[in-house]
Amino acid sequence: MRHIICHGGVITEEMAASLLDQLIEEVLADNLPPPSHFEPPTLHELYDLDVTAPEDPNEEAVSQIFPDSVMLAVQEGIDLLTFPPAPGSPEPPHLSRQPEQPEQRALGPVSMPNLVPEVIDLTCHEAGFPPSDDEDEEGEEFVLDYVEHPGHGCRSCHYHRRNTGDPDIMCSLCYMRTCGMFVYSPVSEPEPEPEPEPEPARPTRRPKLVPAILRRPTSPVSRECNSSTDSCDSGPSNTPPEIHPVVPLCPIKPVAVRVGGRRQAVECIEDLLNESGQPLDLSCKRPRP
């Protein structure tokens, strides 16, 4: 490599160009790759993937039984040359060769040997994990039982006792039957038959009102005796009553009552125990004062 001495510490353009040419020729001449078109990197170039798998110990044996050439020939339908098997070579375990015909022993282009399928035992005889108790419990389903005596011989109670470990526990149905809570008779009482509705009464004609004759009473007594007939009007008569000029004090007047289905308001629980002729009102409303 040449050494260039610079006088004054100044490098001219010609000197710099010669230095670059010398560097390219002597250093990068052999290792410089040829220019090529830029291509985007592939997925395998971006990620460092380890595609080398561990060797399979059975790969060589399988390749000898089913070589790639034989598989390709079978797919393409190409006839192969049959040669007698080597002495001591085992036959495939899952295929059996039929006895060769005399005319097939000669060398030449012949068809593939006829293979007969055999039944293969695919059952796994390896000892696995023993079945756990959880699998047996999941397989058993809960069954609601109804027995004559609650808590005795009930499958529902036995299911809960086995799962919880409590020998005195009972299922919900036996508990309610024992305590008498919210248990009704198995057969409901027959509902009363609805009474036939009475036929609507026919409208009756109102009697005609006879206009009353206002007469001035002769005496304060309402009853009068007739002197000509010597009879006294003690009973009811067909004539309307007489109107007196004197009005009695504090007469009893009828009060209109509105018929309703509401019950009387309840202030405390004791009101429910008191016998009352009217039905009780269990609503939240209170009567106005």
UniProtKB/Swiss-Prot annotation:
It is found in: Host nucleus. Residues 41-49 are annotated as: Interaction with RB1 in competition with E2F1. A zinc finger (unnamed) spans 154-174. Residues 84-93 have a biased composition (Pro residues). A motif (PXDLS motif, CTBP-binding) lies at residues 279-283. One of its GO terms (biological process) is symbiont-mediated suppression of host JAK-STAT cascade via inhibition of STAT1 activity. The modification Phosphoserine is found at residues 89, 219, 231. The keyword Nucleotide-binding does not apply. Pfam families: Adeno_E1A. Residues 76-140 are annotated as: Interaction with UBE2I. Signal peptide: none annotated. InterPro entries: Aden_E1A. GO terms for molecular function: metal ion binding; zinc ion binding. Residues 219-237 have a biased composition (Polar residues). A motif (LXCXE motif, interaction with host RB1 and TMEM173/STING) lies at residues 122-126. Changing residue 178 to P: No effect on ATF7-mediated transcriptional activation. Transmembrane segments: none annotated. The keyword Transcription regulation applies. Residues 82-107, 187-245 are annotated as: Disordered. A motif (Bipartite nuclear localization signal) lies at residues 258-289. A motif (PXLXP motif, interaction with host ZMYND11) lies at residues 113-117. Interacts with host UBE2I; this interaction interferes with polySUMOylation. Interacts with host RB1; this interaction induces the aberrant dissociation of RB1-E2F1 complex thereby disrupting the activity of RB1 and activating E2F1-regulated genes. Interacts with host ATF7; the interaction enhances ATF7-mediated viral transactivation activity which requires the zinc binding domains of both proteins. Plays a role in viral genome replication by driving entry of quiescent cells into the cell cycle. Stimulation of progression from G1 to S phase allows the virus to efficiently use the cellular DNA replicating machinery to achieve viral genome replication. E1A protein has both transforming and trans-activating activities. Induces the disassembly of the E2F1 transcription factor from RB1 by direct competition for the same binding site on RB1, with subsequent transcriptional activation of E2F1-regulated S-phase genes and of the E2 region of the adenoviral genome. Belongs to the adenoviridae E1A protein family. This is Early E1A protein.
